[in-house]
C-alpha cells in the first residue's frame, strides 16, 4: 500500500485486509497492527480529556478508571502512564483455574511498577453475563478477595451495592439483594470480610511483592501474534505467557509483569515468551541485562519482526 492522503487509509476489516477462518487474521499485519494502536490511543485520548476536565477543579484528587485484566483491545501499559493508580474489575469465570485470575491481578500490579492496585469491582454473589451465571458458594467471595489482597490489592470493593431494578443488571449480584435487607448470607459474608480486613490493614496496606523474576508482556506482541496468518493456527501468545506464569506460581516464585519499556536492572531472571516483535532498542536492553549478570529466557516464535511487523 502507498498512502498519499489520510482519506486513502482503508480500515482493516473483512472488506479489505482481514479474514476470519478461525479468528481474525490479516494479509497485511502492519496496517492491521497500526489500526489496533490507533484504536487504543483514541479511546485513551477520551479518558485523558475526561481526566483533565476533572483535574482542572480537583487537581489533588487521584483519578483512575476501571481496567479489565487481560483485555485485548486496549494497551494498558500506555494507559497506566496516564492513571494516578490502577483499578480493575475482576470477574473470573465459573470453574476457571485460580491461576488465571491470579495472573490478571499480577498484571495489574505490574502496570505501575509493583505499586498496590484497587479491586474496583467484583460480584459478591453472581454475575449476569457469563455463560452460566452460577452463585458463588459460601466462602468463595472471601477466597477471591484474599487472592486479590495477596497479589497487591489495597482495596476490596464490589459491584453493586444494591441490585438494579431494571435492565440486565437486575440479574447481577449485590451487597443488598432484591429482598432489600441485610438478612442474607451474602451480606453477612461481606460484613465478616470487612471486619477481617480492618484487623489486617496495618499489615496489608501498601505492601509490596519483592520479585527477582520478571515476565515480559507486551500488547503489540499480543496483537501481532493474534493477527499473524502463519506459521501455525495454534500460536497463542496469552496461553504461552500463562503456562510460564502458572509454573512460577505453583513453584511459589514471586514475579512481576513488565513491559518492554520497563527497567530490568532489579531482576535476576527475565522471561519473554514468544517475543515475536523485538522493538527498536530492545535487543540492546537484553544484551545489557545479560552482560550485567542477568539470565534472559525466551521461546519459539521470537525475534521475527520489528515495531511495524
Indicate where each model-derived feature is located.
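Carbohydrate-binding surfaces of carbohydrate-active enzymes
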Residues: 13-14, 18, 32, 48, ...
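Active-site neighborhood of glycoside hydrolase catalytic domains
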Residues: 1-82, 264
Amino acid at each position: 500500500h502507498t498512502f498519499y492522503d489520510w482519506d486513502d487509509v482503508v480500515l482493516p476489516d473483512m472488506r479489505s485486509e482481514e479474514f476470519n477462518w478461525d479468528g481474525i487474521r490479516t494479509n497485511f499485519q502492519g496496517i492491521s497492527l497500526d489500526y489496533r494502536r490507533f484504536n487504543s490511543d483514541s479511546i485513551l485520548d477520551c479518558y485523558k480529556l475526561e481526566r483533565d476536565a476533572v483535574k482542572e477543579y480537583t487537581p489533588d484528587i487521584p483519578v483512575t478508571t476501571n481496567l479489565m485484566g487481560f483485555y485485548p483491545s486496549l494497551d494498558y501499559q500506555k494507559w497506566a502512564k496516564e492513571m494516578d493508580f490502577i483499578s480493575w474489575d475482576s470477574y473470573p469465570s465459573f470453574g476457571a483455574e485460580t491461576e488465571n485470575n491470579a495472573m490478571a491481578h499480577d498484571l495489574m500490579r505490574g502496570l505501575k511498577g509493583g505499586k498496590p492496585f484497587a479491586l474496583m469491582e467484583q460480584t459478591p454473589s453472581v454475575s449476569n453475563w457469563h455463560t452460566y451465571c452460577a452463585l458463588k458458594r459460601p466462602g468463595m467471595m472471601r477466597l477471591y478477595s484474599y487472592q486479590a489482597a495477596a497479589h497487591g490489592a489495597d482495596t476490596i470493593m464490589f459491584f453493586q451495592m444494591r441490585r438494579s431494578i431494571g435492565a440486565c443488571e437486575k440479574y447481577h449480584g449485590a451487597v443488598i439483594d432484591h429482598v432489600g435487607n441485610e438478612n442474607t448470607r451474602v451480606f453477612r459474608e461481606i460484613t465478616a470480610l470487612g471486619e477481617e480486613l480492618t484487623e489486617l490493614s496495618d499489615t496489608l496496606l501498601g505492601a509490596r511483592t519483592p520479585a527477582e523474576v520478571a515476565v515480559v508482556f507486551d500488547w503489540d506482541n499480543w496483537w501481532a501474534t493474534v493477527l499473524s496468518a502463519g506459521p501455525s493456527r495454534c500460536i497463542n501468545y496469552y496461553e504461552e505467557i500463562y503456562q510460564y506464569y502458572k509454573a512460577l506460581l505453583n513453584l511459589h516464585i514471586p514475579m512481576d509483569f513488565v513491559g518492554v519499556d520497563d527497567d530490568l536492572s532489579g531482576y535476576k531472571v527475565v522471561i519473554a515468551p514468544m517475543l515475536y516483535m523485538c522493538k527498536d532498542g530492545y535487543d540492546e536492553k537484553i544484551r545489557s541485562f545479560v552482560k550485567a549478570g542477568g539470565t534472559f529466557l525466551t521461546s519459539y516464535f521470537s525475534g521475527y519482526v520489528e515495531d511495524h511487523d
